[in-house]
Amino acid sequence: MTRTRASGATGESQAWLATYLGASKKPLTILAFLLPLVVAYEIGLAFALRSSQGVLTNKAHVTLLRFFDTFGISAGGGLYLGGAVLVVVLLVWHVLTRDPWRLEPATPGLMAVESLMVTIPLIVLAQVILRNSAGSQPMPATPVVDPAALGSLTIWSKLAISIGAGLYEELMFRMLLIAVLHTLLVDVGKLNSTLGAVIAIVVSASAFTIYHPQAADLGSGLFYFVAGLYFGGVYVVRGFGIVVGVHAIYDIIMVSMLPS
């Protein structure tokens, strides 16, 4: 009887885990998880990141603004458009999958916990590389300004800029770049899906490294490449929501460690 009950409990746990792993990769659940981050960043753009010199943001967001500019949308008009685009993309994705408009209330909270846990190895990696390189500053994964300038920001500005990096850098380097590369390699080039994913992750990590000006230093360059591989692996295995959460949490922790 005891063995039967234990077996039943194990089966229920495995079924619950499988349900969570699947649900957390669905676009509607990802939207529910990311919507508070999108709103927080938009509020940050309006208040915490605005000064007499303009609005401080990350390079990925600036790239998106330049893309909007090609369609005649000015930087001022497109500044808050990125968040809307991300929401629309997830909603369209949900409609195309034809999944029901139903959410498990606990799933977004569990995704936050998972994101925090998955961030820990990246923090350990950063500290190991930091101790063995010439640099002495924590390494945020967002190239906004130099570390000294990041350290001078208010806590709310640091929080907003970190969230923005998670949203827009993962949108650019993981959701868009990996998807495009995988389509070209697998659907067009007829490569094996796993091999195509690996190549896409490596290329994305290389682009992510070049994107960071600090990567000119050997130690920093190594970190950003490995971090790009890590983010790419998380994206492929656990989806867009979790990788955004990991990136944002990592940056929040690293930026908060910078000296004022």
Q: What residue ranges belong to the model's regions?
A:
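N-terminal juxtamembrane cytosolic/stromal segments of multi-pass membrane proteins
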Residues: 1-28, 55-59
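Hydrophobic cores of alpha-helical transmembrane segments in multi-pass inner/ER membrane proteins
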Residues: 3-4, 80-92, 172-179, 240
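Interfacial transmembrane-helix boundary/kink motif in multi-pass membrane proteins
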Residues: 18-26, 34, 68-76, 99-124
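Alpha-helical transmembrane segments
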Residues: 27-41, 114-118, 200-206
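Alpha-helical transmembrane segments of multi-pass membrane proteins
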Residues: 34-56, 123-127, 131
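Interfacial helix-start motif at the membrane-water boundary
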Residues: 63-86
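Juxtamembrane helix-loop-helix connectors linking adjacent transmembrane helices
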Residues: 95-166, 182-191
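Transmembrane helix-loop-helix hairpins at the membrane interface
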Residues: 155-260
